[in-house]
Curated annotation (Swiss-Prot):
Coiled-coil segments on the chain, per record: none
Membrane spanning residue stretches: none
Free-text function comment from the UniProt entry: ATP-dependent specificity component of the Clp protease. It directs the protease to specific substrates. Can perform chaperone functions in the absence of ClpP.
Name of this chain's protein: ATP-dependent Clp protease ATP-binding subunit ClpX
Amino acid sequence: MTDKSKDNSKSLLYCSFCGKNQKEVQKLIAGPKVYICDECIRLCNDIITEETIKQNNITDTENKINYLPKPHEIKKHLDNYVIGQNYTKKVLSVAVYNHYKRLYNFNKKTDSVELGKSNILLIGPTGSGKTLLAQTLAKLLDVPFTITDATTLTEAGYVGEDVENVIQKLLQKCKYNVKKAELGIVYIDEIDKIARKSDNPSITRDVSGEGVQQALLKLIEGTLASIPPQGGRKHPQQEFLQVNTSNILFICAGTFSELSKIVSKRLDAGTEIGFKANIKEKKQKKSEDFLLKQVEPEDLIKFGLIPEFIGRLPIITILNKLTEDALVNILCKPKNALIKQYQTLFELENVKLEFNAESIQLIAKKAINKNTGARGLRSIIEGILLNIMYELPSMVNIEKILINESVVNSNSLPKIIYGKNKSKKASGE
């Protein structure tokens, strides 16, 4: 009996790696004088996959930096999508280029000079292109990008979004790949809305103003943020994803209404007074664009941003209010111009959509009157095309729809060209 069991053990085959015999595993694969079981194969596969992901992340980072477009190439790309704002585009092109070159220096980990991070503050009216510029940059660089509304943020422990949710949104954009998130861009809109109520420290708690600024300081400067995996809530027993925000580029933006008045007061206080004062110069009203271009950190402090917060945003650039001509160009010229978008939409119904020059000028004028900038253009066009977009899918034999100034000005019905050269107007209320 004992001899039989010895013979059986000798006839069994064993995994050369874990030592389990063929009866203890599902599969045992034989090689020249070596065996490997299915469990060891899975373990090896997991190790290789993990190493490959790590290597791919490093390679991906290096590739992004090695193939980084030059500043003039970045600006040229921005020109294709954003009309005007040439100075701001130049500032952003240089800032983004330097930021990602800095990462290359950081990854080399040499004993050379350590380069600081330069986050950006964009100041400009509604619809001037702040968000579009940031989105276009992120697409060009192929990095994760997220937009957060500063008005939804509160200090930790209060009702509202914790500031670390900003990083969680960025992680969601890249499927919780931490290395990719650490190369991303965070755009915080409406940053002017978290200004404290006065430039004097308040004894009452300002959880959605100065409190949020304080909470954002470390995040923007660079810290190790602990983020719950897969968007879960924080609790002490769980493991957190550690995200280093030192290499994340933060772009903050806002309209900063009334900031021009603060700048104007400062400039007026610096002018000569008394009999030698230049009365003519004093009477001249300076434009808002001119005043904002003279903005200094002290003006932003008076507005309600704390000095430490301004210090984390060393690059400040101003976007001009868009003129009527600029809005006309926005409607027609960029790659994703609104007119082109609606023409493509109508092409899906095999119908050509045409706007004459006068109608486009009137649409731009309406946006100027509404003080909505480029952001208001889409809602104006939607209103103009509502009836025809409602009727069109049910109509047949339509070849072309013509939009002229009367359609824009008095909301009259557009002209319809039928396939058999019949001309009718769209039905509508």
